């Protein structure tokens, strides 16, 4: 991603209304291009392999492959893709597990679209195991 290119993002959430809402909210922001939306971790991995996004916005609790499992695989298979968790779970254990699995940022679903967009941008700019929390 260069400064003049939009941030390419995949969204993964098992709740259709949340997933579709995030596509509309983030896709309407300048500088963000939502390139795919998945209902589970396996679909998310396939979309990341297909589209090579800069970042993925990922829920923790999804069917087939949950967010932690998807985060571990994404971090191993696509280390250049920034992983940002967006979930309803704010407990320390969930935060620590997600960050240890490879997430660069962790937000709860009460974050507004500006906070989510900033977390995605900050995480995409981070390198290595740098963490952006909160963004």
Model-predicted segments: where are they?
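Conserved sequence signature across two-component system core domains
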Residues: 12-13, 38, 56
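Active-site residues of response regulator receiver
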Residues: 13, 59, 87
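The feature encodes the CheY-like receiver
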Residues: 18, 58, 63
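Short hydrophobic/Thr-rich beta-strand motif most characteristic of the beta2 strand and flanking loop
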Residues: 31-39, 47
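Acidic catalytic/metal-coordinating carboxylates
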Residues: 40-43, 64-69
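Short amphipathic alpha-helix used as the core "switch/output" element in two-component signaling
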Residues: 46, 68-80
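Active-site beta3 strand of CheY-like receiver
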Residues: 51-57
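Short, flexible helix-to-coil linker/hinge segments that flank and couple to helix-turn-helix
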Residues: 93-100, 104-135
């Amino acid at each position: 991603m260069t400064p003049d290119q939009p941030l390419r993002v995949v969204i993964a959430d098992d709740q259709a209304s949340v997933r579709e809402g995030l596509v509309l909210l983030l896709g309407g922001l300048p500088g963000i291009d939502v390139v795919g939306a998945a209902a589970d971790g396996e679909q998310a991995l396939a979309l990341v392999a297909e589209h090579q996004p800069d970042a993925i916005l990922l829920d923790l609790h999804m069917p087939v492959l949950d967010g932690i499992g998807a985060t571990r695989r994404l971090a191993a298979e696509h280390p250049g893709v920034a992983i940002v968790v967006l979930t309803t779970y704010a407990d320390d254990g969930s935060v620590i597990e997600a960050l240890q699995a490879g997430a660069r940022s962790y937000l709860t679903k009460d974050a507004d679209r500006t906070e989510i967009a900033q977390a995605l941008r900050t995480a995409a700019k981070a390198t290595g195991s740098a963490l952006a929390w909160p963004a």
